[in-house]
Amino acid sequence: MRGSVLPEWIDVNNHMNVAYYILAFDQGVDCLWEQFGITQHYINVSDSSTFAVESHVTWQRELSADEPYLITAQLLAYDEKRIHQFMRMYHAEHGFLAATAEWLNLHVDLGARKVAPWPDAILSQIAQFAERQEDCGWPAEAGKQINVPKPIYSAMRKD
């Protein structure tokens, strides 16, 4: 998915605000869902959708107003009800990695508001996407935990 940093996305530090990275990645997820057949039509007809239940974002380099970006998606894992994806945001002209996002989504029956299995047609599309990425490997940025290496204070500390 391609986009451009809108001027209203710029914060007091004169770079793209964190909230808009999430927005851009969310739009990237929508593009990925379309490849699987999870469209507005699917949501309306099936009364099913996806809910994000966990995410982790890393910021690598700043983006400024009007700069173009490219978001790519990689499937990390899936099962009959869940999908774990990883996205990268690159500067579309200079090629540098600006940010990454890792998300876990659930397939949900909207009427029951409960997790539900993927329909076979969607699961088949997810499987085909995964097969095309078998050689991609696990991204270095995926599965990270927030950490202060040598904290002065830590709530985890048992001194």
Where does each model-flagged region fall?
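HotDog/MaoC-like acyl-thioester-processing domains
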Residues: M1, W59, L63-P68, L76-D159
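Short helix-to-loop capping/linker segments positioned immediately adjacent to catalytic or ligand/cofactor-binding
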Residues: W9-N13, W59-R61
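Hydrophobic beta-strand-centered segment that forms part of the acyl-chain substrate-binding groove
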Residues: L32-A77, K81-I83
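A broad, structural micro-motif
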Residues: M16, T50-A52, A98
